[in-house]
Amino acid sequence: MRKRLMAMLQNDISLQQQENALAKQSAKFHSKIAAKHQLIKRQQRKLEKLNQVANERKEDQENRSAFEQSMRDKLLREQQNLSEMQTELATKKQRRDELMGFVRTMSEATNTYINLKALPARVKGVALRPEQGEWIPFNCDAYDLKGLNALWSRLNEPSASTDKWQQLFSAEPTAKEKENANASLSSIIEIDLTSPTAHRSLAKMLEK
């Protein structure tokens, strides 16, 4: 009986020791699990911060790319506008150069001198008639067809250049050009070339 009690006591002691060992292992395991959880949480917070930074950088990059594209588009439009302006200016310059050359040629051929500085807005100058001993100053709006026709009728003389003068002064103006037209043909004044002041007046007329 005593041996049996001693054996039972030993078993109880052994079980108690095993339980204590298991309890220690369990506590150690739970401690490690808790430490792992804390580590995971810290890593998650770091990951969230990294993701936030990455998203901000991505957004900045997208904004920068959009801005760069916008600037490229704007630059392209400005280059196109500049190219169109250069083409338009070149066309206008060519047309003006042709007109100036034509006016010079016709002036020499018909003794009619045009103030080139007044073109293209106005037709201003003087027509010489040496055989009559007179000169006729004129100043009219370049788009005033009635005034130009009156001028042409007044200055019209038999000449091989008549058709060219009519072609020069009979082009139909645009609506905008008509709106911008100023006064009609100024009064035509005949002045005797033999007058003492005729040549001085002629020089002043061509300079204006």
Curated annotation (Swiss-Prot):
Statement: the UniProt record of this protein carries the keyword Nucleus: yes
UniProt keyword list: Cell cycle, Cell division, Centromere, Chromosome, Coiled coil, Kinetochore, Meiosis, Mitosis, Nucleus
GO biological process, one term: cell division
Coiled coil: 31-101
Keyword Hydrolase appears in the UniProt entry: no
Annotated localization: Nucleus; Chromosome, Centromere, Kinetochore
GO cellular component terms, A-Z: Ndc80 complex; nucleus
Subunit structure: Component of the Ndc80 complex, which is composed of Ndc80, Nuf2 and Spc25.
Protein family (similarity comment): Belongs to the SPC25 family.
Described purpose of this protein according to its UniProt entry: Acts as a component of the essential kinetochore-associated Ndc80 complex, which is required for chromosome segregation and spindle checkpoint activity during meiosis and mitosis. Required for kinetochore integrity and the organization of stable microtubule binding sites in the outer plate of the kinetochore. Participates in SAC signaling that responds specifically to disruptions in spindle microtubule dynamics. The NDC80 complex synergistically enhances the affinity of the SKA1 complex for microtubules and may allow the NDC80 complex to track depolymerizing microtubules.
Name of the protein in question: Kinetochore protein Spc25
Organism: Drosophila mojavensis (Fruit fly)
Gene for this chain: Spc25
